[in-house]
Amino acid sequence: MARLRHIAVCVKDLEKAAKFYETVFELKRVGREDIEIGSAIYLSDGVVNLALLKFAGARGNDLADPANAVGANHFGFQVDDLAEAQRRIEAAGGKFFFDLGDARKGNFERKFKDPDGVLFDISQHGWIGTDGCG
């Protein structure tokens, strides 16, 4: 079976975005690339690689500017303590967006936006089909 191990997100400011995810979720910086079309900082929790991307502009072909391209809607982090995670998110500049699901049924997630407006969620129970979701 294939396993999801990499998510890439376009951001406005690489360092600011990296600091946010390092501070809030204790992700480790595992790499950086600076190439002709842009730059990337790679973070990881040891299982999944989160690539933060900043493109230099249009690639010189008929593709739309990557920052405006259709792509991922959001991603999620499983946390040990929902309230503590929310405190850390907001202290680092993230903004609460909305709650989704029913906490009594174990399918609850709390949605936020990072300082660039990228949507992500947190869950104490995980998501259907993952190890943490009962």
Please give the residue ranges for each predicted region:
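Acetyl-CoA-dependent GNAT
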Residues: 54-58, 124-126
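Conserved catalytic-core motifs of GNAT/GCN5-like acyltransferases
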Residues: 8, 28-34, 99-101, 127-130
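Mid-chain, well-packed structural core segment of small domains
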Residues: 75-83, 89
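Core segments of cupin and vicinal oxygen chelate
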Residues: 2, 10-50, 54
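Short, charged/polar surface micro-motifs in flexible loops or helix N-caps
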Residues: 46-50, 57-59, 82-84
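Vicinal oxygen chelate
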Residues: 42, 86-134
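N-terminal beta-strand motif that seeds the catalytic metal site of vicinal oxygen chelate
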Residues: 1-16, 72-77, 125-134
